[in-house]
Amino acid sequence: MAGQTVIVSGLNPAAILQSTIGGAPVAAAAENGHTRKVVPLSKDALQDFMVSIITQKLQDDKQPFYVLDLGEVVSLMEQWNSALPNIRPFYAVKCNPEPSFLSMLSAMGSNFDCASRAEIEYVLSHGISPDRIVFANPCKPESDIIFAEKIGVNLTTYDSEDEVYKIRKHHPKCELLLRIKPMTDGNARCPMGPKYGALPEEIEPLLRTAQAARLTVSGVSFHIGSGDADSNAYLGAIAAAKQVFETAAQLGMPKMTVLDIGGGFTSGHQFTTAAPAVKSALETHFHDFPELTIIAEPGRFFAETAFTLATTIIGKRVRGELKEYWINDGLYGSMNCVLYDHATVTATPLACMSNRNNLNCGGSKTFPSTVFGPTCDALDTVLRDYQLPELQVNDWLIFPNMGAYTKAAGSNFNGFNTSAIVTHLAYAYPN
């Protein structure tokens, strides 16, 4: 099946497409009336697929590109449903809003966490209904609240009295989730606690404020922070959430029915340790809430490993043993994750021009290397003292695990347009 092009399309961007490959569903939505091509591959053929894309490029078209492995997305959803079957994912759109990726997640049952009017409009444009959206931003512009009321997004978060007043004025039928601050951020790469979440002493006053405003507080939300967080952080946060449920009951408020455990999940070892801890904590603290709806806001769990970035070497300089390379994406583009998401990127050579018989330069001597991005800012340095074989201009560097907070947060600085980077679709089967 490898190399065969399968064209799939749907009536709208959220349609579950009926094409199958080897019995496995392939979902990729029609975008703005255009079909997308999905290439089925064996798991170890992704590199060959990338080489085929590079080979088909014109001599003057060496722009970076992504490959989205839809097979990886299916695998991750299967892992989620197996490990946390009673927790409904609301994918964090901010992490990566690539259209076919969102359509795939939607087709597999994911709902969506949006933080702005623009994100809500984007999700709705894919045919996804507003009742599948949580407006998970505790501090929203009044204009966004008015928009949410107009189109029927009726679940949001809050952690301040002023937010209650805005919602009471503009969207009184909206159900609220009280965002609380976890006791620990679990050593997350991107902690959320300094900015969001009610402190313990603020919880009862905030519940009373919502009660006085005649708003419905349906439950509690928290976020332990993004990226590699210690799974034990979920334990304390879930226990604290239960205390909020009890406080609301003591105040005579309607019984809470929703618990939002936020994000912070990373695929791999962190998830395999976090999922049992979450299940255990929920059983301990919420076993007497059989009708409880539990949701989560995973972003990088689904996005990070599903995307691979290919970049061209556009410049080279040799200083003794040190090899310096310039590539056509960098810290002002996809690699902004190095600065803002505290990510560590890795690179694999693809010597399409200089060594076609040994694309990965296996067995070749390696040298300490620096990889710069394309802009004129010296800060735009992707890798330092990184071991690479000697490469040439027009060779390529491949960056795996580039789906989380990459293209979505890139800029157009110096005229390098991150948003213009094309994404190719593949469906890789496990070996």
UniProtKB/Swiss-Prot annotation:
One of its GO terms (molecular function) is ornithine decarboxylase activity. Keywords: Decarboxylase, Lyase, Polyamine biosynthesis, Pyridoxal phosphate. The keyword Lyase applies. Pyridoxal 5'-phosphate binds at residues 226, 264, 297-300, 405. The record marks 223 as: Stacks against the aromatic ring of pyridoxal phosphate and stabilizes reaction intermediates. The active site is at 376 (proton donor). It is an enzyme of class 4 (lyase). It comes from the Eukaryota. The keyword Plastid does not apply. Homodimer. Only the dimer is catalytically active, as the active sites are constructed of residues from both monomers. This is Ornithine decarboxylase. It comes from Solanum lycopersicum (Tomato).
